Amino acid sequence: MKCKVEKSKISGQIVCPSNKSYTHRAIFLASLAGNGSKVENVLLSADTMATVEACKKFGASIEIENSSIIVKNPIKFDKIVPEINTENSGTTIRIASGIASLFSEEITLTGDESLQKRPMQPLLDALSSIGAQCQSTDGKPPIKITGKISGGDVTIPGNFSSQFISALLISAPLTEKGINLSIKDNLVSKPYLDATIATMRKFGVSVQTLIPYKRYNISPQVYNAATFTVPIDFSSLALLLSAAVLNGDETVIKGNIGNLPQGDEVFIDILEQLGVTVNIGEDEIKIKSPEKLKGGRFDLSNSPDLLPPLTILALNSENPIEIVNVKHARLKETDRIAITSRELVKLGIKVQENEDGLILESTENLTGAELNSENDHRLFMAFCIAGMYVGNCVVTDPESVQVSYPDFVEEMNRIGARIQPE
């Protein structure tokens, strides 16, 4: 499918979706705790439903009531588990792999064609070092894991994905010995690790930080039943803010901001550096944009999901926008650096692709084009917002938004966007 996107202005109120990362983590931890654990204000999307289905395969009894998930009975580690298909969700397969290593019987985990291109080897090596038997297809899914891991000393690289570390942390308290975790190389996406630890603490597990982002100790413990409220998703909020900056007129973004750590909240600072005035209330955000953005140099090493919403702001920037230290964005659902470079140049802006980022510079010759999002949800949304600014665009793969923001097109059209399926 494709969507036709015409030049358009948005105004009014729009509600930001709940946080995908916290929804994943809270569902897994509620499923490990059971006993009526409840996750409120969840994001119900294709990715998070993959986590729900994985937990059910592990034996958890889960009910969905409106925007809440209730876990009556926890994961059963003596269960024979059928193959788990995590669809397109990298978070699901990585955390589920850690949990699978707590079972004695072999468990197979797989995903769709895109997921089968994403690396797993660093996590598999770490699990193997503490007693798991792991098989894969050249370090990628499908994978087979046989436990049971006993715990102990584990070393894992931090420069691929923080999801590997999150998987080890979540499984650690349920091992016989606990885990002493050492992270080598520079850790990317640090705030996502903070999110994992914050969620674990909400479910009663203590994580001892020996050296931040380098060494952690998790002793044998149990997860306790809890109620967890998911905050808004700053990754999705960044896209809505970009839409308001480029195309907004009195646009108000509503949602439960909360006080849990989110790496992508740095987008507020980025907007202010670009010259945007941002007013944050208890449950809403308003912005006021200058006629032209300032441009600047931005390090996205800890927030790779901000690459799509930041790149499109170059359309209305008087100076170049340079994005650095985000090489790991090439390992997302797609190679977001390469695809962004390839597609945005069609709109008439100048793009220099570097190994770890991009330099983007607007021109006076912006023009509509067909933009191929390669079935990447964040690229689809970013390209639609760009199309609203430039006009006369076509964007491929609208179905991709099911993984993070299923109502994106409908909600944007409700406040004035002109995005029509073809």
From Swiss-Prot:
Pathway: Metabolic intermediate biosynthesis; chorismate biosynthesis. GO terms for cellular component: cytoplasm. Pfam families: EPSP_synthase. 3-phosphoshikimate binds at K20, S21, R25, S161, S162, Q163, S189, D305, K332. Phosphoenolpyruvate binds at K20, G90, R118, Q163, R336, R378. HAMAP family: EPSP_synth (MF_00210). Belongs to the EPSP synthase family. This is 3-phosphoshikimate 1-carboxyvinyltransferase. The gene is aroA.
